[in-house]
Structure formats: C-alpha cells, structure tokens
Amino acid sequence: PDVPAIVVAGEDWNAGVIGIVASRLVEKYYRPSIVLTRQGDIYKGSCRSIAGLHLYEALAACRDTLIQFGGHEMAAGLTLARDRIEDFCRAFANYVDTRMAIEDFTPKISIEALVAPADWTLAAVEELALLEPYGMGNPRPIFGVRNLRPQTAAAIGAEGRHLRMEVGTREHRVAALC
C-alpha cells in the first residue's frame, strides 16, 4: 500500500476525542491509525488497529522511541517525547509494512447468511426491524447475495450523495437506496 499506517499529530487536541478520531481513520482508510496530541514537550496518543496487526506487539517493537505505552491487540495508548516523533513514525510504519500483506489492507466482512434476492420482501425487512436497536451488543446483521449485479443506478439527493438503484439476478430485481 501507499501508506501502511496513519500517524497524525496536533497541538493541544482534546485528549478525550483522539481515540474516536483514530477509530474514524481506521473506518475510512482501513489502516492502523494513531492520533497524537502535544502536551508541552511530549505527545500522548491513542491507537486503533485492523485485523491482522497486534497493536501492543507493534508498539513493543517501537519501545525504544516511546516513554510508555499500553493496550491490547486492537487499541492502545502511548506517550513519546516531542523529539522522537519522526523516529517513532518511521519505526511504526516499517513494522506494519513488514508484517502485513497487501490483502490485509482490505477489510473482511462477516455475513450472517447468504440470501436470494427473491427473499427480500417487505415482510422480511419488517421482521428484521424487530431486532433493533443495533449497537455494540447487537450488531446490525449483514447478508450476502451471490451473482448480484447492478441493473440501474442514479445519483439522488440535493448533493447527489445517495444512490437509487436496482440490483438483482436475471430472474429477480430489487430496488435499493444507498
């Protein structure tokens, strides 16, 4: 990949939100992400990982550039001196680059079940709605469909940010909004 990891730093960023920002970077770019905020002569950071990279082990490999660190496989925190930030960025990117294959930077999606387009009925959607609300303890179900092809597509909305389309197989089509 062009960039194996993302490390961003800022002056006096709110330490209470840098973990959220790191998570959003992972969601958007699917790269291990570290967000650092400067506090005097040190940087404190929040880290989030992707599947296949044990974040604590990655930070342990960079320990000579850090004041302290802690965490687990998918999330961690760290502290480093202001004058070590470039050394840390280089060491962390090198560690990620040597441990991850190009296909590791594509997110994997776990599906609940394979379904046929003919099974997508209003009654089925209403039945799924009974499982709401979705969240951490009750994730939104994801279904897979084989041999699905887009049939038509058109941008909609004031800024064209949504897509109205028909998808389906040769035998059955379903309207979809994205």
Regions found by a protein language model. Give the residues of each.
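Acidic, two-metal ion nucleic-acid-processing modules in DNA metabolism proteins
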Residues: P1, A5, E27, G45-C178
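Flexible, glycine/threonine-enriched loop-and-boundary segments that flank and lead into catalytic domains
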Residues: D2-A22
